[in-house]
Amino acid sequence: EMCIRDSYKGKEGRKLIAVELAPPLGIDDEKIMDAAFLMKESGVDVLTFPDSPSGRTRADSILMAEKVSRETGMCVMPHICCRDKNAIAMRSQLLGAHINDINNFLVITGDPIPSVVRASVKSVFNFDSVGLMNIISDMNQEQFAGEPVIYGGAINQGRVNFKVELERVKKKMEAGATFFMTQPVFSDEDIDRLRQIKEQTGARILCGIMPFVSLRNATFMKNEMTGINVTDEILSRYRADMSKEEGEETGIQIAREIIAKTTDFVDGYYFSFPFNRVHMLKKIIGKNNQ
């Protein structure tokens, strides 16, 4: 069930398509299950599930991935972050996941807990993503020797000190990361930096694409989300009085432009859609990826 590895063995020149589906904040999973089935029809290779991003509690990423895998038969990849669990909880979760055939992971350090809840909730951060990769690497030699876990890391191409990011990518590769998913790409500078990472490390890169659907959506992401560098040029393409359709169309157009500029060197694309608007995917990749 090493589906992410198998997905790369597909047609030469074909890009791997991953789509992020956020687990629900409550227990109603109808929307996420509908989205998963729609993504299956759209020819998506991998579905990924974030691990309570921005410190907001969501349904467990591994359990959600397990249900989606069981019901759709799709390749799934939960994110696991270092914010909420110590090494015992982490190893225990990895063992349980493996027993349930979940053995592809995106390993990230995790966002800090928002200041609002910080008084009542303590972050763990016993280790960062490289430390967690080393734990999985050890487990791959021991418990998982017959069927090792495949894992990748994140690239934050917008990091102020780019040299540091480049070194982090190399460290993650040394710790066994076999692919990377980037923060959403919006500018030519982002693209140049990813190209440099590719040239200097040979890393397998899935380029992050986050299509905004309105000026409000784009402005919120620019101001509130760490690691997402939304340029003024992107903002200027949205108007406050756009219809829902016009907003989506603008997001689709920008996504296509980013794909055109990166297709010569990236290995695939990693989409996250605001407000679960996964129907936009077909209009972005069309038939050219089948």
Which residues does each predicted region cover?
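Conserved anion-binding
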Residues: N104-L166, A175, R195, Q200-E224, ...
